Amino acid sequence: SEVYGQVDPKDVPIKETAPLKPASPYAVSKTTQDLLGWSYFTSYQMRIIRTRMFTYLNPRRVDLFASSFAKQVAWIERGLQKELTHGNLDSIRSIIDMRDAMRAYWLAILHCRPGEAYNIGGTTSVKVGDFLNRLIALSSVTINTRCDPNLLRPADVTLQIPCIDKFYKETKWEPQYSFEES
């Protein structure tokens, strides 16, 4: 979840009690959403559960990170693109399948305590470059890659690994789909 910003490796996996340090406009918007949820819970007793979702794969997601990689591989296989472009491949993420993410949201509604924040994410982590290499290995053609400076973030968050113990305790949720099934 972008709300935590760049964390020290000693603070991984990231717990819900970690300070919120958004490092991009997108992260600020997610942090604001989280804090508004808290405000509406405390001010108006609205049943708001604050979820902090980490990276998930979705074939219909816009051209971000993993979805962009998959789309580019498909285009290269069809001869519509010559090389795969990417940003920072050294970042580390926990990645889950969109179906696991949606099931987690449903379980949060059913079992989590209003006002509380819950991390939702994978139980394993992968370097973005390793993820890309695994995806390329599934391709039927040779794929050349190139770092595009326009895809490098000014303030990149390089380590996003959640502690999902609190969410698991409330819901018994854990990811069911593997990388290969996503």
Language-model features, listed with the residues they occupy:
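Non-catalytic, hydrophobic alpha-helical segments
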Residues: 101, 105, 120, 131, ...
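C-terminal "lid/loop" region of Rossmann-like NAD(P)-dependent oxidoreductases
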Residues: 84-88, 115-118, 126-133, 140-159, ...
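Residue-level signal for the nucleotide or nucleotide-sugar donor/cofactor binding architecture
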Residues: 17, 23-24, 64, 93-99, ...
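C-terminal amphipathic/interface module of NAD(P)-dependent oxidoreductases
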Residues: 159, 163-182
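Active-site helix of classical SDR
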Residues: 25, 29-32
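Conserved Rossmann-fold NAD(P)-dependent oxidoreductase catalytic core, especially the SDR/UDP-sugar
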Residues: 1-24
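NAD(P)-dependent short-chain dehydrogenase/reductase
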Residues: 7-13, 35-93, 98-109, 123-125, ...
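Catalytic Tyr-x(3-8)-Lys segment
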Residues: 18, 85-92, 171, 175
